[in-house]
Amino acid sequence: LGLAYGNWLAGIQNMGFKWRGQIGENSGGLDLRYVGLSDLELRSNKPTSKPLGYYSAYGISARGITSREIGAIKFGLALQLIELEIYQESSRGVAFDFGATWSINEYFKFNISALNFGRMNKLESSAPELPKRLVNSVSFDQKSSSLFIGIESNSLLNDMIYYVGGNSKYKNLFFGGTATSTKGMKSISGGVGFLLGIYTITYGFQWGDHHLGRPQM
């Protein structure tokens, strides 16, 4: 069970809820997420000291997850319901995720996933395009540490995205980081966490080269 809250540039807020558990022979989960603004100003074409009003823009998603392990391969499937709203316009849609992990041996794993394959209803005159993603990665796990490299194809970008990162754990402390690179963009993200019995406290950051600030969660 997990709860998260974050804030970023211009008052953007995000909140998340996660649950993981066992459902019969399968593993299951539920993810809820909200990202939004609540103080956008509506103004006319003429300069005024006060706005005509205020409105919000937000996105909400609810995702159900199930997974099952067959031999050395673990399969996962997710169904996601999405709602977007800005001013007086809204759009709803559905997306599917699929993933598989093959344990090559005791240390190496090969991962493949297809994310955000679905569609949205029209938002005013056109439907929002979901960022369809195909991600492949190889990870190396040893005791309390893990390293990985990955490559991603994204329908909204012409160039591939490359990842390299890792994480480690020492007693009740765990930490990790990831470097991401594609044409015109590079970023570094990381975080630390502390286990307190059944509770976990985490702090994360992401730093990019678009100078949009440093989001924290």
Predicted features, each with a name:
Residues 1-217:
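Subset of outer-membrane beta-barrel
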